[in-house]
Amino acid sequence: ASTVSIKAGADAPYAALSMMLGEPMEYKEDAADDNVIFTRFEKSICLNTREEPIVEIHDFKDLYHLDEGIGSVIFDLDDTLYSEKDYVRSSFRVVERMLPEVNNIFNKLCAALEKGQPPLETVLKDAGMHSDELLLKCREAIRDHKPEISLYEGVKELFFELHTQKRSIGILIDGTPKVQRAKIEALGLDKMADEILITDELAGHGNVMEFRKPNDLPFLIMRKRLEIPCRNMAFVGDDIEKDFIAPKALGMECYWKKNEDGLYE
């Protein structure tokens, strides 16, 4: 006789116990054709059996009453927990201090942003000061600055409530690590979240875009750090196009914090 060994997913221990106890089990035909993920990170297969839609929330208090089975809540950052436009305005103040000779430069940068124009390039060209060297200096100063930003109303109270309910909190974000770390510190999230993961840090010297959402690897790493199954996790984001592809496929509960005043709305 020969033995066949199958490396299964997070439900393998449950399935093994059910078989040992002679309990009936439900199987899904052709599961590999629908909502199946194989991950080399955990060397496992995960089947998404969660059929719930993405839930739109209008107030952070809507997250006070999650299902009892949810042990961790993962949040996006930009335009989910704070206004990214506030960060951009904070960066414009840096440029204003650098270039006091440009009259009314802050308002001009804001106006270019609202028109969908590249603010720095537009304003510097209009002022007859455009150069690659000056652009680089401005961008370096922006990356190095401590942003003047604040959390949306209700975020601190929500985090306190989630911790009171013994639910862990994670922050999972794309973006330049130095910039995102500065935002996290300015918002005080480094003292409020249990785990923080910046996807670009996973790339090392490689292509950071490969690790950004909708890649599922950052979510699996977060799951491993928080030591909780994906089905017991919830994800909150603002970008309906890309934020929820991976967490939904992994079986997490998904909550959409629609932001009509977002930077990329």
Go through the PLM ranges and name each one.
Residues 72-74, 170, 234:
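Hydrophobic "anchor" residues on beta-strands that sit immediately upstream
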Residues 156-164, 223, 244, 248:
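Surface-exposed amphipathic alpha-helices with a cationic face
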Residues 143-171, 178, 216:
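Short, acidic loop-to-helix structural element flanking the phosphoryl-transfer center
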Residues 1-59:
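ATP-dependent carboxylate activation and anion-phosphoryl transfer catalytic cores
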Residues 150, 176-234, 241:
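Substrate-recognition "cap/lid" segment bordering the active-site pocket of phosphatases
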Residues 66-69, 164-167, 222-232:
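Glycine-rich phosphate-binding loop signature in dinucleotide/nucleotide-binding domains
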Residues 234-264:
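Acidic, Mg2+-coordinating phosphoryl-transfer loop and its flanking beta/alpha structural elements
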Residues 66-153:
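N-terminal helical cap/lid subdomain that shapes the substrate entry/recognition surface
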